[in-house]
UniProtKB/Swiss-Prot annotation:
It comes from Archaeoglobus fulgidus (strain ATCC 49558 / DSM 4304 / JCM 9628 / NBRC 100126 / VC-16). The gene is ogt. Keywords: Cytoplasm, DNA damage, DNA repair, Methyltransferase, Transferase. It catalyses: a 6-O-methyl-2'-deoxyguanosine in DNA + L-cysteinyl-[protein] = S-methyl-L-cysteinyl-[protein] + a 2'-deoxyguanosine in DNA; a 4-O-methyl-thymidine in DNA + L-cysteinyl-[protein] = a thymidine in DNA + S-methyl-L-cysteinyl-[protein]. SUPFAM superfamilies: Methylated DNA-protein cysteine methyltransferase, C-terminal domain. This is Methylated-DNA--protein-cysteine methyltransferase.
Length: 147
């Protein structure tokens, strides 16, 4: 388990058996920092370096959510896909994709911030009430040069 600072926020990763099982943003560090390769990878990412975050993970999710998140994990750094594109690839509805993305236990590691709506950016679920999800999504996309 480790926390990485990003401006006024912290990105926290829970590891079990060498795999990430949960990640989340907070306004305080949940864990100590780490000099692990995974922490260094995230530090580089949050400093604006073009880094594909490659942290092994274990998903605790339904088979449908797992399929959606596997599709989301293929979206490259600096790119976005619409909910409708993912829905078409998986033969389902954009709304169902949105619900699965909302349940992503591993934001950034599985880059759900790269999924957007046709007319607007779409939401971004965060577990900390002090953080506005939509603003955080925009900030992550700006970091990757999308905006």
């Amino acid at each position: 388990m480790f926390s990485v600072k990003w401006g006024e926020l912290y990105f926290n990763v829970v590891m079990e058996g060498g795999k990430a099982v949960k990640s989340y943003f907070s306004t305080y560090p949940s864990f100590s920092s780490s000099d692990s390769e995974y922490a260094r990878q995230l530090e580089r990412y949050f400093s604006g370096e073009r880094v594909e975050v490659r942290i092994p993970y274990r998903l605790k999710a339904s088979s449908f959510t797992r399929r959606v998140l596997e599709e989301v994990s293929r979206i490259p750094y600096g790119m976005v896909r619409m909910y409708s594109d993912i829905a078409k690839a998986l033969n389902t509805s954009p709304r169902a994709v949105g619900q699965a993305v909302k349940r992503n236990p591993l934001p950034v590691i599985i880059p759900c911030h790269r999924v957007v709506g046709k007319k607007e950016i779409g939401g971004y679920t965060v577990s900390c009430s002090d953080i506005d999800g939509k603003s955080l999504k925009k900030r992550l996309l700006r970091l990757e040069g999308v905006f």
